[in-house]
From Swiss-Prot:
Protein name listed in UniProt: Mitochondrial carrier protein rim2
Any one GO biological process: mitochondrial genome maintenance
Compartmental location: Mitochondrion inner membrane
GO CC annotations, alphabetized: mitochondrial inner membrane; mitochondrion
Transmembrane segments: 38-58, 105-125, 152-172, 214-233, 262-282, 317-338
Native source species: Schizosaccharomyces pombe (strain 972 / ATCC 24843) (Fission yeast)
One of the record's GO molecular function terms: pyrimidine nucleotide transmembrane transporter activity
Pfam families: Mito_carr (PF00153)
Length: 347
């Protein structure tokens, strides 16, 4: 005869499976209009980009090789990871202060125009592709039921589509942010001027520099989506358990549920960004303007990885990580939080 301890794990496992199925069914029953993902993603992306624009400027500068002599050598001397992280944090604060003092407050938002022009369609495309893609893939391959494999495929497809569609915009944004104005005339007068000069000097292919690194970064967005869905499922199961037990939902429960989603978005981004960060550095280096003599220092993905490694070591591949995390983690919370709120009303 089986003991209670032998039965309970099986019963709990079965109950969890039932709750997961119910959560999936509930999600499918209230499937929002396809275009709602597009609208919610674009608005959420805009809000996140505006809120974290100054840190995006700092991150881009720390990733570039223009700032390596001043900041990176000091960080490279740090043997302790905690000391290196602290130096990265101080570098972030120093650059924020210097940009404001020497270039003005508006410089903290330099590149925001093309950033918004890139972010809004990028987020719209990504959320639209992922939101509708996972539903289509679930219908095709898993009888309408979502799981981690479905989320993985949908996120990867959405990442490739988004990267290919928006690479020229990100290239312009990067070059405008690295275009220093103190002590010399600006190389680019505007986003249009940057596009014209890039095509004239480097050809149409110049607008797609860094695309290989962007495609490499699809892994980051894919991992982020999969992790976020796990956190969302945990919240959904908690809600269903309350409902089955007849427990009335309180304001505290709602706050806890929304906090779980926001926290899940932040943790998912933190983990994904930490793992995949080197591709961000390489992508920024590949998108830099050519040197004064017109010869680009970085000519390809592998060559760029090797050169950064030889010149600066592993620290070079993680230049600007602190500024990056300070930006992308709150950005992810704002992005996914805004997306969920908007979808709640229009979905």
């Amino acid at each position: 005869m089986l003991s209670n301890s032998e039965i309970k794990p099986s019963e709990n496992s079965q109950k969890t499976k039932v709750l997961l199925t119910k959560a999936n069914n509930a999600s499918n029953e209230r499937a929002p209009p396809p275009l709602s993902h597009f609208i919610a993603g674009g608005v959420a992306g805009m809000l996140g980009a505006i809120a974290t624009a100054p840190l995006d400027v700092v991150k881009t500068r720390l990733q570039s090789d223009f700032y390596k002599d001043r900041f990176l050598k000091q960080t490279a001397k740090s043997k302790s990871p905690l000391t290196a992280a602290y130096r990265h944090f101080m570098d972030t604060c120093i650059i924020l202060k210097n940009v404001k003092v020497h270039e003005g407050t508006r410089a903290l938002f330099r590149g925001l125009g093309p950033n918004l022009i890139g972010t809004i369609p990028a987020r719209s495309i990504n959320f639209f592709s992922y939101g509708n893609g996972k539903r289509i893939l679930a219908d095709l391959f898993n009888n309408g039921q979502e799981n981690s494999q479905i989320h993985l495929m949908a996120a990867a497809i959405a990442g490739v589509i988004t990267s290919a569609a928006t690479n020229p915009i990100w290239l312009v944004k990067t070059r405008l942010q690295l275009d220093k104005k103190s002590g010399q005339a600006a190389q680019y007068r505007s986003s249009i001027d940057c596009i014209i000069k890039t095509i004239r000097l480097e050809g149409f292919r110049g607008l797609y520099k860094g695309l290989s690194a962007s495609l490499l970064g699809v892994g980051e967005s894919t991992l982020q989506w999969v992790l976020y869905e796990k956190f969302k499922h945990a919240v959904a199961i908690r809600q269903l358990r309350r409902k089955e037990l007849g427990i009335q939902e309180t304001i505290y429960d709602k706050v806890l549920d929304w906090g779980g989603k926001l926290g899940g978005a932040g943790i998912a981004k933190f983990m994904a960004a930490g793992i995949a960060y080197p591709h961000e550095v390489v992508r920024t280096r590949l998108r830099q303007s050519p040197s004064i003599n017109g010869t680009p220092k970085y000519t390809g993905l592998i060559q760029c990885f090797k050169l950064v490694w030889m010149e600066q070591g592993i620290v070079g591949l993680y230049g600007g990580l602190t500024a990056h995390l300070l930006r992308v983690v709150p950005n992810a919370c704002i992005l996914f939080g805004s997306y969920e709120v908007i979808m709640h009303f229009i979905g």
